[in-house]
Amino acid sequence: MSTVSLRTLPSEAARSSRNRASKRHDGIFDGYNSLGGYSKAFDEMFDADGNVRGPYKGIFTELAPSDASELAARSDALGRAFIDQGITFSLSGQERPFPLDLVPRVISAAEWSRLEKGIKQRVKALEMYLDDIYGEQEILRDGVIPRRLITSCEHFHREAAGIVPPNGVRIHVAGIDLVRDAHGVFRVLEDNLRSPSGVSYVMENRRTMARVFPNLFATHRVRAVGDYSSHLLRALRNAAASNEADPTVVVLTPGVYNSAYFEHSLLARQMGVELVEGRDLFCRDNTVYMRTTEGERQVDVIYRRIDDEFLDPMHFKPDSVLGVAGILNAARAGNVVISSAVGNGVGDDKLVYTYVPTIIEYYLGEKPALANVDTFRCWLDDEREEVLDRIDELVIKPVEGSGGYGIVFGPDASEKELATISKKVRSDPRGWIAQPVVQLSTVPTQIDDKLAPRHVDLRPFAVNDGDDVWVLPGGLTRVALPEGSLVVNSSQGGGSKDTWVLASRASVADRELAAAEVVRALPKAAKNSKSEKSGDESSQQQQQQGHAEGPGQPQNQQQQRGQQQKQSEQQQQQAVVD
């Protein structure tokens, strides 16, 4: 197993303390602390005695006097703001509103400092690991991790060998998923080093909350999140070849049917770069060009939101209609930078995840600042046998799974389901890991006309510009809305919360940035609404100018329909917003 202890539940003393002494609160918090189904979890607003924790005192003071009608009014205001801004995510080709809860998650400055340190450490170590794996492979020669761990990884692409980023950065953006266990300790649940989704909802959640609850922000020192796009643009521009003083950067999207298309469009607009599809680009002489209404334009950096397998039909899926033929050869020649780098999946494979603490110690000579969740490696005989013996009490996860799909919760599974998953583990040990049931921490969440505990996780986003790793203060808090559920994924009924990182009192810059963010979020005067809308439309029209059709062979209607159907299917196969 990847760590020593399997105990993720609190001690009997801690549990009995919470059950024995529970301060009663009235109004919308009535009965909150007596909900036994969540008694084993660490609640982030209330301690075991029902006292409000320090970071949440202002939130509690603001919300506690509210009655059911006021709660509903606040929730309706949030919903209308989201609809007005067109904030949705696509699931199975259908646009849906992204649920935002009205109670923010609050993280103290001291707690965030510890998390930020651990995230930076992890990203730096994984950066060194990827450079080594696609280079000298010293970690394999030294026997620190098994060679077969890499050769058996579906996302280890030999095609990526020889592609050396100009500034040495392969992980331009990372999403490190964290959970808080029953002891209140943050642990890493998963690394996302390819195309982590969700940052657009972080920014839009903040914008919406600031519009609806400006008074709350006025009484808290909440660090801003709106400058994410400027950090990302700096990282992408820094990634270009050193001889490019003004590099051309584009965002490559699978298309409008992808679940994260809203995010692709938002980031491109905020960075002031073109949003393109594969059909807008072509390669000639190992150089990538963009078709525009003004002619061809060379592209220097591509922030791609397309999976490796669809990126280049010359090297991966030959039937891909989303990618650009020859783009890998152009990257190998040093004429374009692909962000994040091809082959990064060998760094966020769920089995590789169990070795990350070892990777950190090997490359940095440091102990991990953030621990993993305890994990069994089913490909090791002794650990696999223990998993099979205890399968009714563990969580079994597919190594290649995403979106919460394929996970089996042993305590909730039927005998038939347990027999089926046992058979799968035996037949493909490399394809599975197992973990104890982690009682994710809880935060008050609106459920009908009351606030009730619901489990949450956290996805902070880190941006590496080659000089430093910057971590967005907070990140995407996802919440499991169905009662008792531990599955937070939006594709399975999850919602989200605005995540507040409180600035230290000494940080004047953070306070000023946060204040400016709130001011920008406030609704403009009515007389300006028409011109504002016109400006948005103009911006979108300018962005679409890059999508000139360019020369092509005529197709009959049947061929066109077939091509469109394939394009839609492949767009939906890409990574979902989770």
Predicted regions and their residues:
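Preference for protein termini
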Residues: 1-578
